[in-house]
From Swiss-Prot:
Organism of derivation: Candida dubliniensis (strain CD36 / ATCC MYA-646 / CBS 7987 / NCPF 3949 / NRRL Y-17841) (Yeast)
Membrane side Lumenal: residue ranges: 1-63, 113-173, 227-261, 306-354, 399-423, 494-530
Region (Disordered): 610-631
Cytoplasmic face of the membrane: 85-91, 195-205, 283-284, 376-377, 445-472, 552-887
GO biological process: methylation; phosphatidylcholine biosynthetic process
GO cellular component: a single term: endoplasmic reticulum membrane
EC number: 2.1.1.17
Protein name in UniProt: Phosphatidylethanolamine N-methyltransferase
Transmembrane segments annotated in the record for this chain: 64-84, 92-112, 174-194, 206-226, 262-282, 285-305, 355-375, 378-398, 424-444, 473-493, 531-551
Amino acid sequence: MTSIINNTNSTVFDSTNNGNMAILEPVQPVSKGPKGITFSGQTFVVPETHDMVKTLFDPTVRKSNFELIILGCLFSNLLVFLIPNNQIRIYIFIALYIFWRLSYNFGIGWLLQNQSNHNLLVSWSQKYKLFEPGNTSFLAKSIQNEIKSQRGENYDIKSMPVEFNTWLIFRKFVDLILMSDFITFCCVVYCSAIKNNYQFFNNQSSWLVYSRIVFGTGLILFNLWVKVNAHNTIKDYAWYWGDFFFRQINNEELIFDGVFEMVPHPMYSVGYVGYYGFALIAKSYVVLAIAIFGHFLQMIFLHYIENPHIDKIYGPSKNEINLIKILKLKDLKNFDNLKPLVGLTNFNWMRASDIVNLVLSLTYGIIIPLFANSIKSLFILTVGMKLFESISINLLLTLQSYFKVVTKWSLSNDIPVEKSLSNWAVLYNSLINLTYSSLFGMNLGYFLQKSSSSSSSSSSSGLLFSDWFYLRIFLGLLLVYTQFWINFSIIDSIGYFGWFYGDFFIPKSQSSIKNITTAGVYRYLNNPEQIFGVCGVMGIFMIYPTVENFICVGLWVVNNFIRINFIEKSHMVKLYGEQEVNRDSGVTKTVKKHLLPEVIQRRMSNDEAYARTNGISNGRRKSSNNSHSNSVADSLDNFIRDLRNSSTKLSQQKLIELSQNLSFANSDYKLTIDGLMQSTEGELKYTTIGTPVTISWTSPEKNHSVRDWVGLYKIVQTSYSRNKTILSSAGRWTWCKEANGTFIFDREKLFWEEGVYEFRYHLDGKHEVAYISEPFEIKSVELDVPAIEEYANEFAENLKLEIFDKVINLTNINEAISPIANQSDNVIEVYKLISSMISKSTKINITYKIFLNHDLLSIKDVAIKLINIKHVLEELSFNITTDKKDI
């Protein structure tokens, strides 16, 4: 389920109307209630709906035909209890649960994915005319009767959009599957709990039984609160995936309020802790296994169905994505333009430090434990490595924060500050790897020694506790996974710059980082690594609860606490200020808002205001990339998008037929293209990428409309229809206000890629075609790269004339490219376009990163780079040839 928040204003554009604002007519009289708008631009008032529990189980709410069927299906589960054998009942309910769970995650998932990408459900409704009053088919009558029974006899089906009516029917399938899924799970819980003469409260001490029941009930109640709070926040619209069918006006951004401010995707994460509470109460590994199974499938559903749709509808704009890309690319500039090694992630065989890290990790994690004589020696090694890492890293960070010792040393030795951060990253990661490798090696040694023992009783010797082995394994692995997930979430939020304490080493004026982040995992927690950053060590202790592991947990926790609260925090306050550092996290806000009495909330607010006035600070974690706001992504017609992405090739015969314009031989309308070149007779005329194209049109005076227009299209996308254009021109068009005239298509009006194109003359603001021009080709210009730098100026002038002048306005070949290119709304695309044009024109491949790595790069510098690249490539080619001759 997606989450939404109110926004102020929204403007809807018709993607098939050349960027002009569509006039949206409401389909019913204006009344109170939220306003909806379909993806085709039809507006309506969204009627009130109820949640599934109220709809199905509240006797005061009218039951529809489908709802009565759903209730019958739910109560039919009781028939299984007529079977006397409880184990058979468990098998049946597990099979039913698996069926409904797969129906949820793969059935509903498939429908939603196709609805999001292809408008499938709405297309079905339109294809079979399910909501047409005159349709007398059994399916249509059943569907219409269902809606009438839901909404009442006075509900006018025809007055509401097909999208909304389809959503009403889709909701009933959701009700059936979700309620059946939950009911069958509860049946599994009950049958498992009463197994073996009510085993859930037998064979355990009373305090442990009560603890399980109390803690399990707490998880279930917390789960219930999460669901209720989430529904109160996002309402039925998002609960039933309404934004897959239509949008609510002024509800166009993701919400981060209530439970959505506590954890990411609460409906899929903490929204399933109640399942584990049921497993705890039932004291059943069977229940735990199916709870894990269901939760795992739900995370798959989130990743492959929910998140892609959220990104499409609520994701960042192109400019915001562009900014994020720039920041991430500039983040790598501090690490030699390669992703640095984090643990053993981003491993590169061509990087010496990575090889050393791998060798050390294997040595301390595997080789030493294989030859160690005792656990004690491995324990001493692990403690020694952790103490060495803690003291050295904490000392260096403190000295760098207060005295800039690393920066001063680097500058005194003519080493750039960026290089000092890269060197620090290698040192920091190497020491962290050594500590975790030693910890892993200690536990591997323990396992090897215990497994080699012949006495079965010795297998649990040395453990602080040995019960609940499988539960310990599950919880331990879960904690280890959580630490990995938190670490990668931190890197995703603050980048490698933040992960390696970049603001300790790089001056703020030279960094793209200006503010502390409030995005990603930092939206919910100020210091996620303070607890979760070491929970993997706690997980290892749960799997092997030895005294040695317990001491290691203490070392990791104490070091983490000192580093964050006494080193990082003070540096952040000094760098970013107390007010910036002192903000409440999402969890803190939610606890204050929902779990603390109002009197205490007011008292805390007053205390915080007083603290800010008097300079009292709590502090928070390191810096990161600027947080970005999510904006509404434009909804595109998927059929048109398929055409746009078409890679169909036209045959030469087809091109000849198109060039003859047989369909418009006797037309009073004409389109001609001026300035095209032709290499040989019979070949298509062509122009070069970025060159302005001038067209002239002629139309009859008496039939001419000021809303006539001309658009530019790829032939491979429009050859399907010669009389009507079914594809948007994407802004590449112009009005024909006069009966005869000319227009120059340039810059954003052009296609910037090779291919065959045509112009189309359309009538009266519509898409009926009156004339199609002859096809023409857009090619890359051919530029020869000189062999020596003496001709760099001449070559640079050619680059400026044939490539750069078509994209950006530079006065001369020595002017820096970056300041001018950065004025563009999408600088990454500008750099990619220039690099692509250069690569195709010179036959020397370069990437857009050369423009990012050198802020003062000029056209002449680019020319020199190309000359040098050509020189190196020719030398390598010559050497290869020479070697072959010598052989």
